[in-house]
């Protein structure tokens, strides 16, 4: 099984990756002995001191020339909907270099023109297939080469697929149900590969995009069948390999597979906060930006649903939110100093940012 190693390797990350003091350089023995004898703990950093090589100095200069003072962001699912609107907001500040992780580079180029992205010199599209673990690893390797030693400041796990109308499971390149792999497992793998590097950044944040449908305490999650329910994760424990399609090990249900995957992504943010926030300084959070009823996410729903669902959400439930507004909300969680707190679930319903959304920011989320 490919799933078990991904999960277990992440939970067993070597703590040494986040820093520990050890006496590695014999030439500093005397100085360290004197420092320890005098309890001058401030000198202990010398135990790890390694003179920078010419190669490292050149790489640092190249990185400074390439990125300047901008923060480096990876945003998945940048070529449509929420991702495109969020990228535009990030670029508009001039403070971020955005790496758009997308499946279709030609489509991404068209969206850049259509959305009239500002500061295009600060945007770099890179290929990523979330239905392939190998592609995730390849993307992370390419990113490492691209950033020239600069630490990653933001990782926004936004990309997702929704296949509620399927009567049978579609499987990924790794023979795992597509929604579970794209929405959850591949993002999980990406986090595990990039997190040690992000710990070097001064103000790192990892943001996962959840869904109200994964929260059974809400009308959208607990009042609409099927309800997200992982049970004892028997499907995941069994390896999630075909023909197993559901995390709970039960028969396939397209809508529930989506809800379960989003629930796992939100739970992951909480788990990461509990296990790694203090060690790494990374702020882990998840967000539900409101119901983007006109989102391309619903492209596989029936035509009548796509026509009437936005009307229902706008005039009956009040939960409707425009893509532009949702993009601003995701941008805020990645950028706003008020959103630097870790372990927070940022949740908006409908309405403008000046209403309940601003109250959520002031209260520190949910």
Residue ranges and their predicted role:
Residues 297, 301-309:
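Mobile gating loops/cap/lid regions near enzyme active sites that modulate substrate access
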Residues 46-298:
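Rossmann-fold NAD(P)H-dependent dehydrogenase/reductase core
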Residues 114, 132, 335-336, 361-366:
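Polar helix-capping/helix-linker motif
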Residues 9-12, 22, 27-33, 71, ...:
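Acidic/proline-rich low-complexity IDRs
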Residues 310-359:
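C-terminal helical subdomain
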Residues 296-299, 358-360:
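Short glycine/threonine-rich loop-to-helix capping motif typified by GTGT followed
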Residues 1, 5, 10, 17, ...:
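N-terminal chloroplast transit peptides
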Residues 251-259, 312-320, 359-365:
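Active-site rim elements
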């Amino acid at each position: 099984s490919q799933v078990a190693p991904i999960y277990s390797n992440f939970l067993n990350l070597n703590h040494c990756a986040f820093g520990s003091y050890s006496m590695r350089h014999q030439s500093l023995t005397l100085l360290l002995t004197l420092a320890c004898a005098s309890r001058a703990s401030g000198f202990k950093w010398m135990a790890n001191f390694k003179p920078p090589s010419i190669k490292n100095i050149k790489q640092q200069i190249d990185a400074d020339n390439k990125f300047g003072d901008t923060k480096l962001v990876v945003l998945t699912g940048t070529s449509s909907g929420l991702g495109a609107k969020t990228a535009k907001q990030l670029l508009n500040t001039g403070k971020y270099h955005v790496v758009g992780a997308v499946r279709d580079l030609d489509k991404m180029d068209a969206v850049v023109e259509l959305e009239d992205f500002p500061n295009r010199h600060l945007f770099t599209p890179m290929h990523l297939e979330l239905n392939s673990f190998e592609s995730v690893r390849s993307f992370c390797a390419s990113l490492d080469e691209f950033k020239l030693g600069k630490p990653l400041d933001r990782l926004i796990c936004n990309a997702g697929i929704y296949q509620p109308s399927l009567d049978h499971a579609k499987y990924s390149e790794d023979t795992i149900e597509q929604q579970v792999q794209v929405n959850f497992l591949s993002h999980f793998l990406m986090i595990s590969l990039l997190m040690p590097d992000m710990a070097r950044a001064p103000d790192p944040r990892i943001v996962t995009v959840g869904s109200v449908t994964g929260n059974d305490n809400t009308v959208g999650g607990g009042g609409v069948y099927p309800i997200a329910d992982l049970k004892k994760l028997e499907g995941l424990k069994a390896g999630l390999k075909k023909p197993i399609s559901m995390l709970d090990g039960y028969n396939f249900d397209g809508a529930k597979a989506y809800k379960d995957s989003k629930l796992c992504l939100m739970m992951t943010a909480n788990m990461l906060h509990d296990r790694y926030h203090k060690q790494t300084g990374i702020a882990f959070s998840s967000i539900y930006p409101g119901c983007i009823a006109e989102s391309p996410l619903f492209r596989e729903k029936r035509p009548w649903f796509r026509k009437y669902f936005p009307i229902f959400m706008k005039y009956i439930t009040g939960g409707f939110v425009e893509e532009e507004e949702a993009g601003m909300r995701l941008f805020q969680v990645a950028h706003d100093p008020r959103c630097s707190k870790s372990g927070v679930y940022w949740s908006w319903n409908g309405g403008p940012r000046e209403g309940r959304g601003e109250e959520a920011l002031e209260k520190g989320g949910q």
